[in-house]
Amino acid sequence: MKDFADIPALMAEIGTAAKAAAAELAFAPADQRAQALTAAADAVWARRDEIIAANARDLDYGRDKGLSPAMMDRLALDEARIQGIVDGLRAVAAQDDPVGAVLSEWDRPTGLHIRRVRTPLGVIGVIYESRPNVTADAGALCLKSGNAVILRGGSESFHSSSLIHACLRDGLRAADLPETAIQLVPTRDRAAVGEMLTMTDTIDVIIPRGGKGLVGRVQAEARVPVFAHLEGICHIYVDADADPDKTARVILNAKTRRTGICGAAECLLVDRAWYDRNGATFIADLIAAGVEVRADDTLQAIPGTVPAKADDFGREFLDMIIAARVVDGVDGAIAHIRRYGSQHTDCILTENDATAARFFQRLDSAILMRNASTQFADGGEFGMGAEIGIATGKMHARGPVGAEQLTSFKYLVEGDGTIRA
């Protein structure tokens, strides 16, 4: 696998190796897979200085490419973020094993006993952009769920991802599992992405994690099934019955904690009655924190806001920018989100149970929240240890994609010489 100039041959070899590894992983004991993840976590921590040095090369590359501050933040690793990678690997290792779990079982009058049990999907292809931690998250979750994985990281994170991948291979080797269970495409050549999208003989599902351009290309060109992770155009609606203290706290966190993640709030909707009664001091708080608030005609009365343009609504800024407008009640908020949202994560701030129920019932985002920061839209925060992404489609996986979502199922039917009449 040394001739990287012949991309089709390279990818065919990777695919064949992954398929063979998947067949072995399907019956590998749970404790063996967990051992690999624990050993990988130890390797990541032991090599943290090397990873940070490799990341510095990636950051230089990103600066030369003119990456935005948000993209540079996604790319950056320090000791605290590496500790997060290690913690994620260990958390996934400690989870209950999804493979072989009995989802349901029943007896039929014919004498048959039927069980529905979880099984791995097979080989998963993950295509992602600048976040090197996805290398660890995706590798861990696929291994936990008994799947082989082919990782194609962004060119920006090439050096960081390569070192993290080496640690994952160390873990596989320590547990006596095939090192080809987790493979990283060893070239920045974009032709590798095109090959992955057509590898129907060896890849069972593709998961793209990145911006609209990447996801759109995958959806348009893939001949392999896709779990789509679309933009995080996350809304927060301040209802007439919102608690002022909770509102101020949640909005500031949802926008400013980390602007470059898909769970960052991008649009603020304010109930007209609330605004008439209370104003919107939380907008002043955002401005004081350095956020550019692009406001509609009504909210432009607040000093420091700037006029919103039509295309500011329905836009993922991934920056210290938020769009804001006044709406007429919860139904106005629902109508706006249906038009401009990406079905990722949307939040209502209210103390009114009936209004919250209406918001939950009439929107179909993958994640709906009440009185909580949209930055909780994360598999780790959901107790999954890690995530590959937030699936916004409606087929198979939806919301945070953890190990359980990377499985299918099969039926095990037992009889006793039973025949059909």
UniProtKB/Swiss-Prot annotation:
InterPro entries: Ald_DH/histidinol_DH, Ald_DH_C, Ald_DH_N, Aldehyde_DH_dom, G-glutamylP_reductase_CS, Glu-5-SA_DH, GPR_dom. Pathway: Amino-acid biosynthesis; L-proline biosynthesis; L-glutamate 5-semialdehyde from L-glutamate: step 2/2. GO terms for biological process: L-proline biosynthetic process. The keyword Lipid biosynthesis does not apply. Keywords: Amino-acid biosynthesis, Cytoplasm, NADP, Oxidoreductase, Proline biosynthesis. It catalyses: L-glutamate 5-semialdehyde + phosphate + NADP(+) = L-glutamyl 5-phosphate + NADPH + H(+). It comes from the Bacteria. Catalyzes the NADPH-dependent reduction of L-glutamate 5-phosphate into L-glutamate 5-semialdehyde and phosphate. The product spontaneously undergoes cyclization to form 1-pyrroline-5-carboxylate. Belongs to the gamma-glutamyl phosphate reductase family. This is Gamma-glutamyl phosphate reductase. It comes from Dinoroseobacter shibae (strain DSM 16493 / NCIMB 14021 / DFL 12).
